[in-house]
Amino acid sequence: MMAPEDVTIRPATTTDAEAIARVDIASWRGAYSEILPDSYLSSLDVHERAGLWRNAVTARATTVLVAEDEVGPVGFTSVGPARDEDAEPGDREIYAIYLHPRAWGTGVARDLMRTVLDGLTPGTVVSLWILEGNERAQHFYRRHGFQHDGTERIDEIGGRPLKQLRFRKR
């Protein structure tokens, strides 16, 4: 089993895009199999996602960090300016934090989160969105000081309307 001390967290580069896409898709398939249709999860395409991650890595205001072990990337996070209508200048949003299922429960997500939070100016408001049925993620974010602030939205994912909950940390 992997241990957090065997994992390095570093800024992502465009050459990481395909590996990030593979982790992204494996995580979605593992985490959302009870929430999203199998047809949608099986349709997720590495090359398409890699293009999105290449753009994210080069975006000026976005920070993408990769967690990797001796085999390669096992997790990543993406953080940038908060996109919500009620966001104040300087508010941040965690757009994504995903781990390959083989890294679940190893402490790598905790270390990624700590790295993100340690990189923020004290007092910065941070938000993120979680699918309503994703109890594992909600528990993880609560442990890191995030709370559901009552804001919800409906996003269509895989042809299905799904409720997302906003969690915030001040």
Model-identified regions with their sequence ranges:
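Terminal substrate-recognition subdomain of acyl/acetyltransferases
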Residues: M2-A3, Q164-R170
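Conserved active-site alpha-helix within GNAT-family acetyltransferase domains
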Residues: R110, G133-G150, L162
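Acetyl-CoA-dependent GNAT
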Residues: A3, V7, P11-A17, R22-I35, ...
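Conserved beta-strand-loop-alpha-helix junction that forms the acyl-donor binding cleft
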Residues: W104, L128-Q138, I154-R160
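A short, acidic/glycine-rich surface segment
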Residues: A82-D86, G150-E156
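Conserved GNAT acetyl-CoA-binding A-motif
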Residues: L120-I130
